[in-house]
Amino acid sequence: MASQGTKRSYEQMETGGERQNATEIRASVGRMVGGIGRFYVQMCTELKLNDHEGRLIQNSITIERMVLSAFDERRNKYLEEHPSAGKDPKKTGGPIYRRRDGKWMRELILHDKEEIRRIWRQANNGEDATAGLTHMMIWHSNLNDTTYQRTRALVRTGMDPRMCSLMQGSTLPRRSGAAGAAVKGVGTMVMELIRMIKRGINDRNFWRGENGRRTRIAYERMCNILKGKFQTAAQRAMMDQVREGRNPGNAEIEDLIFLARSALILRGSVAHKSCLPACVYGLAVASGYDFEKEGYSLVGIDPFKLLQNSQIFSLIRPKENPAHKSQLVWMACHSAAFEDLRVSNFIRGTKVIPRGQLATRGVQIASNENMETIDSSTLELRSRYWAIRTRSGGNTSQQRASAGQISVQPTFSVQRNLPFERATIMAAFTGNTEGRTSDMRTEIIRMMENARSEDVSFQGRGVFELSDEKATNPIVPSFDMSNEGSYFFGDNAEEFDS
């Protein structure tokens, strides 16, 4: 990207910092995850969780959700102004699982939000540490991306369900800041904008008055975020058109859907970072590891090393396969839901299979599920190699891709051809190049038609041995390109119900 000099790295966005050198970034990211770890250890004490229970990913998720809810100011304000029966606006909670007489028991707990905020601040040197909160949101978002398909949401906004590789971060809350915006896929931004435009079409006061002015500012800001994800001039010019639209309506929606489709071949830059469950950081802190002193990076070897020696567990339903549950969580930890399975396969060193073939449902257990039959097993989150996470979409090449998901969004900076189904994608671009964006549309279609299969993405980038911490000897894997590479291939994953 040409503008690299003016961009903050997303490690800096993550920690809310201004420009820092590499050592300072590593220290501030370390401070952030260390704070999450200290908070987790304290919460385990508070809830009297023993070591085994503290390593349970379901307990980790409940604790993460409690602190996120305690700091959700908008929702807290709303709850206080609209008291609903049976909901205490000052309390938050969820299911905590304990081991009793060889069985797992569910206990629904409630805690004062004020108390949780106090514990969180105390673990973070008295600060609000919003970066740490965002980090947990991104972990939840990555878990959702890996677990659910967003077919219904795509169809509702007039997009094609096969565009699911563009939907990274689609369940991230609006309040996730710059770090959240960096990990949102092109499709996610398009969907948010289309929802906004549709509200404007249905509600004539949406863009009017003082509120409307704020809405307009938010609209333009979202347009700029999306524009920044595109790597070609024509796509960016088209985003300027959408942003400057006097009265955003169907023309803008058409343009946005066109742009989303174009991103299947002319990929956008979407950041990827390995965000781990709080219990993993907690385990390291409890064992005396000093994240701030040692430094930490979300895009390098550190998360791989951390997972190499963390033993965490998950509850397993009767018909679920523990190895499949492990794959689900491994992919979520590395934000690899839309990565080419062949790449994930190579890095993980064990077979990574498409979502539809996984005998596992989501990680969380519903409150009406019977605990009698529920067991637990160790999650296998180790890897054979590590690779640097990417923030670019890579350049594009022509390859066979699948019926269910027709493109990938790379997570790891590893040399490969990027598969996409040109015939399927181009079929969506029939005819409609008239109107105010006609020259840009023509240019974008021309670029898509010229994307060649010989082009290899991430030239010379490879994976590294776990002993190679400085990334000195890249191993460039060779992939069998005749095989299927999409995770949501012709798939029947459950829908995410927001």
Swiss-Prot record:
Coiled coil: none annotated. Its main location: virion. HAMAP family: INFV_NCAP. One of its GO terms (molecular function) is RNA binding. Homomultimerizes to form the nucleocapsid. May bind host exportin-1/XPO1. Binds to viral genomic RNA. Protein-RNA contacts are mediated by a combination of electrostatic interactions between positively charged residues and the phosphate backbone and planar interactions between aromatic side chains and bases. It comes from the Viruses. InterPro entries: Flu_NP. Belongs to the influenza viruses nucleoprotein family. Late in virus-infected cells, may be cleaved from a 56-kDa protein to a 53-kDa protein by a cellular caspase. This cleavage might be a marker for the onset of apoptosis in infected cells or have a specific function in virus host interaction. GO terms for cellular component: helical viral capsid; host cell; host cell nucleus; ribonucleoprotein complex; viral nucleocapsid. One of its GO terms (biological process) is viral penetration into host nucleus. The lineage of its organism: Viruses, Riboviria, Orthornavirae, Negarnaviricota, Polyploviricotina. Pfam families: Flu_NP. Disulfide bonds: none annotated. Keywords: Capsid protein, Helical capsid protein, Host nucleus, Host-virus interaction, Ribonucleoprotein, RNA-binding, Viral nucleoprotein, Viral penetration into host nucleus, Virion, Virus entry into host cell. Encapsidates the negative strand viral RNA, protecting it from nucleases. The encapsidated genomic RNA is termed the ribonucleoprotein (RNP) and serves as template for transcription and replication. The RNP needs to be localized in the host nucleus to start an infectious cycle, but is too large to diffuse through the nuclear pore complex. NP comprises at least 2 nuclear localization signals that are responsible for the active RNP import into the nucleus through cellular importin alpha/beta pathway. Residues 1-21 are annotated as: Disordered. This is Nucleoprotein. It is found in: Virion; Host nucleus. The keyword Ribonucleoprotein applies. A motif (Unconventional nuclear localization signal) lies at residues 1-18. A motif (Bipartite nuclear localization signal) lies at residues 198-216.
